[in-house]
Amino acid sequence: MSCVDLQLRGPTACVDEVIDLVLAATQRCGSTMILEDMRNAHVFGVPEEYFIPWYKSEKIVHIERELNSIVRKSKGENGFSSVKIMADQLQCIERKLIESSAIGATQFLPNVAQLFKDSKWIYIKRNDTLRQAISRHMSTETKVNHATQNKDDNHFAGNLLQGYSSSYNRDARYDFQKIKRHCQNIVLENIVWSNFFSVNSIRPLVLSYEDLCAQGNCDYLNLISRHAGVDFSVEEDSFPRRRMVKLSNQKNDK
């Protein structure tokens, strides 16, 4: 059993086990689709956005206990664990971790890097920034982030529409200034990830949402398995179907 030491405001915290895989993402980049495929494979742990509560840092008091809880929840039956982190969560996580004296002052997000120093990384990108920005705007307008194909489909995603309807965003209004701000935020968030990887000498596996959609299958999981050192190969004939469907429709394209 391995252990990650963090210098906190009290005794040294020891995270019982390393999180094996971290998925780096930005909001509405298509990462939930990838998480569903990974969960369906049953070898990549139980990836989820476990750091959402850290947005409200006053709720996170016992760091060691919180981190060990995340490790336990993110672990699959084979002992492999994985989490997803959004770019805008990085500073929230960093603020809750006290800098180690061994970390150079010039390092970018040093405590996050220290926490995941033994983890493998995947960077999920969406090439079309404008479509990603429109997707963010639509989710704000409709309060819907994800949808399933059928009403009786269960899914782990939040803000879920069970049973997709193309009229879900019928009353949504376009706002050029808001979409422009979303575009700017997406660019900045991707810069944050690029800087984090560069400064901390991390070489992630990069996945493009558009490429995966064009591929039309789950063969990309073989890339993830090789990157993460997991014994797995996709068998398309028997691999579970996705319950989640695209929200994008003609209104998004106007």
Predicted regions mapped to residue ranges:
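Short low-complexity, flexible loop/linker segments enriched in glycine and/or proline
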Residues: 61-63, 221-223, 249-250
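Residue-level "edge-of-site" marker
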Residues: 51-52, 210, 237-240
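PAPS-dependent sulfotransferase catalytic domain
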Residues: 86-199, 204, 212-233
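Short secondary-structure transition/capping segments
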Residues: 58-59, 217-218, 245-247
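C-terminal accessory extensions appended to soluble enzyme cores
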Residues: 1-8, 230-254
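Hydrophobic residues at beta-strand termini and immediately following loops
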Residues: 207
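Alpha-helix termini
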Residues: 43-44, 141, 214, 242
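PAPS-dependent sulfotransferase catalytic core
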Residues: 1-87, 243
